[in-house]
């Protein structure tokens, strides 16, 4: 019989398997369990094939829990919602006071807070831990965002710091904060990811539809961008995608992929939280809307027929463009819009941190996103430095370095958006990011008229720019008295 293991992991889908193997490879003996026992056997076999790693499989929850040294630490990687509650119920029947459960899935933060409270009443510790990096990251080093019981974090800190992605500033993991902060931060990470991916897709559309770049040229362009300021995981994989030939037919695989984007819900949660917190996040919101519209494939096919019959083609005009100039303009537009997406995400995190008194460190979040995760990018180091310079920075756009870059790139950004509008190509991410930038940098907006309208029909009052206090005007009476 094997000696007690250091940790347990329940839930052996792709992420669970790979994280378990990563933990074992780092020298921590691990017990694994899955309700479908074939997954247990599959994981044990992989551990043997990948170097006789210290991984032990169990087919029933009681023997699984009893195989782990005390105080026990168990990571769950199961589907969010009811499956998490069911797994907790199964495991907690065999756990003892001081043991710890960690939810490593994409869970709604309030569910984590509810579960932490329920576990505390039983004498158990609980963490909600966002894990980013996909299957490759889980196996070789993810970015991890644990929040909840600090005592629970200390029980597993030695493992997490070894298992996480490693960058020049240390492991890509840190204790995020109290309650559901870890899950909340991971949710916003995913919202930023939505924005990032949408902006890249729009850059691709403009280059292909207006610039007429081939897949070979697109591969070269994105590979070149990945050697500069846009260096990131998403730009890297985009270059890779453009180079893959279709193994089931002629041409390139990307052109055969149905233009219908799926989603699992974290982007929607992010936009809902933006509304709840009254934080503008148009880049992220437009990326979600774009996914909704992509899902209307059949309707779009019919709409295209209707408008083509009326003379409105897919692309409105074949514009003659300087290809080299266009590529450089799109690069600058993508970078500037990307800054807006990250600024919106960070503002959401800060607003929630204030509301919940989490005291989150935005610079440290940028640091742990530098490696392992899907949004890892070179410029995250500069975001960290911006918050190091000013922890109370109200918006990334006004950091001295980032504001300078926005000023330098805004002309190219406007050219790209105008070009796309002229060609009838939708760029909701770039356009909404530009509108966000323009609204934020203007001292006075036309909101005065909107507030006057509200006071006219609803007596909602208004403030004046010259006299303090709340005012109401009988707009209707004044207007009609002049007739």
From Swiss-Prot:
Does the record bear Cell inner membrane in its keywords? no
Query: Which GO biological process entries does UniProt record here?
Result: D-gluconate metabolic process; pentose-phosphate shunt, oxidative branch
- Primary localisation category: cytoplasm
Q: What is this protein called?
A: 6-phosphogluconate dehydrogenase, decarboxylating 1
- Tell me the function of this protein: Catalyzes the oxidative decarboxylation of 6-phosphogluconate to ribulose 5-phosphate and CO(2), with concomitant reduction of NADP to NADPH.
Q: Which family does it belong to?
A: Belongs to the 6-phosphogluconate dehydrogenase family.
Superkingdom of the source species: Eukaryota
Residues that hold substrate according to the record: 106, 132-134, 189-190, 194, 264, 291, 454, 460
């Amino acid at each position: 019989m094997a000696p007690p293991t250091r940790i347990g992991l329940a839930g052996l889908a792709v992420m669970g398997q790979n994280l378990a193997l990563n933990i074992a490879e780092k020298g921590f003996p691990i017990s694994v369990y899955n309700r479908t026992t074939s997954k247990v056997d599959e994981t044990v076999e992989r551990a043997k094939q990948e170097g006789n790693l210290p991984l032990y499989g169990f087919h029933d929850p009681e023997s699984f829990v009893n195989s782990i040294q005390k105080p026990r630490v168990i990571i769950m990687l199961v589907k969010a919602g009811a499956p998490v509650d069911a797994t907790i119920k199964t495991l907690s029947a065999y756990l003892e006071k001081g043991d710890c459960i960690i939810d490593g899935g994409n869970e709604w933060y309030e569910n984590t807070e509810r579960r932490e409270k329920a576990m505390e009443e039983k004498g158990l510790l609980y963490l909600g831990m966002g894990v980013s990096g996909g299957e490759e990251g889980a196996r070789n080093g993810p970015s991890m965002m644990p929040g909840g019981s600090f005592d629970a974090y200390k029980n597993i800190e030695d493992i997490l710091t070894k298992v996480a992605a490693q960058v020049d500033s240390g492991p890509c993991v840190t204790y995020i904060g109290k309650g559901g902060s870890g899950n909340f931060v991971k949710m916003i990470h995913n919202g930023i990811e939505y924005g990032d991916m949408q902006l890249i897709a729009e850059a691709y559309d403009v280059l292909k539809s207006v610039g007429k770049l081939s897949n070979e040229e697109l591969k070269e362009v994105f590979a070149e961008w990945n050697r500069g300021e846009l260096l990131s995981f998403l730009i890297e994989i985009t270059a890779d995608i453009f180079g893959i030939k279709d193994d089931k037919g002629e041409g390139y695989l990307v052109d055969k992929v149905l233009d219908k984007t799926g989603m699992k819900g974290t982007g929607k949660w992010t936009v809902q939280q933006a509304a709840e917190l009254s934080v503008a996040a148009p880049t992220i919101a437009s990326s979600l809307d774009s996914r909704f519209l992509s899902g209307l494939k059949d309707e779009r096919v019919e709409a295209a027929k209707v408008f083509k019959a009326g003379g409105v083609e897919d692309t409105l005009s074949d514009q003659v463009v300087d290809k080299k100039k266009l590529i450089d303009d799109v690069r600058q537009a993508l970078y500037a819009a990307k800054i807006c997406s990250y600024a919106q995400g960070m503002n959401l995190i800060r607003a929630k941190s204030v509301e919940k008194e989490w005291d989150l460190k935005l610079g440290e979040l940028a640091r742990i996103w530098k490696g392992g995760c899907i949004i890892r990018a070179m410029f995250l180091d500069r975001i960290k430095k911006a918050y190091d310079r000013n922890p109370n920075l109200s918006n990334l756009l006004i950091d001295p370095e980032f504001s300078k870059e926005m000023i330098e790139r805004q002309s190219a950004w406007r050219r790209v958006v105008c070009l796309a509008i002229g060609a009838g190509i939708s760029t909701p991410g770039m356009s909404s990011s530009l509108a966000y930038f323009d609204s934020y940098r203007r001292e006075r907006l036309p909101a005065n008229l909107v507030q006057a309208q509200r006071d006219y029909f609803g007596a909602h009052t208004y403030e004046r720019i010259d006299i303090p206090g709340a005012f109401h005007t009988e707009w209707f009476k004044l207007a009609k008295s002049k007739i």
